[in-house]
C-alpha cells in the first residue's frame, strides 16, 4: 500500500484540527491517505471533480469533515461511488448539532456513514475497517488494536470516590480504591 487509499477532505483549512486525529490513526495503521480542502459552498466544482474522480485514482474511502450547514459529506456522497464517512465539526453557535443533523439526515440512496461530533479518530478507524474488506492485514491490525484497548485503565479509579458512590462494574474490572 503506497498510493493513497483514503481521502481526507474538509471544507476549510480551519477544519484540520478536527480532522487530524483521523490522519493520526490512519498513519498508525500504515494506511496511505491524501488531505485536501474542497468546499461545497466556495469551490463546488472542485468538490464535484474530487468526488467524481477519487475512485479513478485508487481512493477507496472518503472521510469528509464540515461544520455549520455541513453539506460537504452529503454532496460528495451524491457524486462518488465510494463510501463516505462524515465528521460533523463543532462551531460556536450550536456546538456541532447543526453539522451532525445535516450529515446524518441524508435522503434514501445517498448514504453517509456519520461519526460523533468531532469524532475523527472513529472516522479513521471506520475507514480502516472498511478497507479491511479488501486488505486482510488491516483486519489483523484492527484485531491487535482492539486487544490492546483491553489494557485501557479508566481514569476514575485513582480518584477518591465517596463510599456512597455506586459503581456498576463487573468484579473483573478491578476493585474500587
Curated annotation (Swiss-Prot):
Pfam families: AIRC. Its EC number is 5.4.99.18. The keyword Isomerase applies. InterPro entries: PurE_ClassI, PurE_dom, PurE_prokaryotes. Substrate binds at residues 12, 15, 42. One of its GO terms (molecular function) is 5-(carboxyamino)imidazole ribonucleotide mutase activity. Gene3D superfamilies: 3.40.50.1970. It catalyses: 5-carboxyamino-1-(5-phospho-D-ribosyl)imidazole + H(+) = 5-amino-1-(5-phospho-D-ribosyl)imidazole-4-carboxylate. Pathway: Purine metabolism; IMP biosynthesis via de novo pathway; 5-amino-1-(5-phospho-D-ribosyl)imidazole-4-carboxylate from 5-amino-1-(5-phospho-D-ribosyl)imidazole (N5-CAIR route): step 2/2. GO terms for biological process: 'de novo' IMP biosynthetic process. Keywords: Isomerase, Purine biosynthesis. Belongs to the AIR carboxylase family. Class I subfamily. HAMAP family: PurE_classI. Catalyzes the conversion of N5-carboxyaminoimidazole ribonucleotide (N5-CAIR) to 4-carboxy-5-aminoimidazole ribonucleotide (CAIR). This is N5-carboxyaminoimidazole ribonucleotide mutase. The lineage of its organism: Bacteria, Bacillati, Actinomycetota, Actinomycetes, Mycobacteriales. The gene is purE.
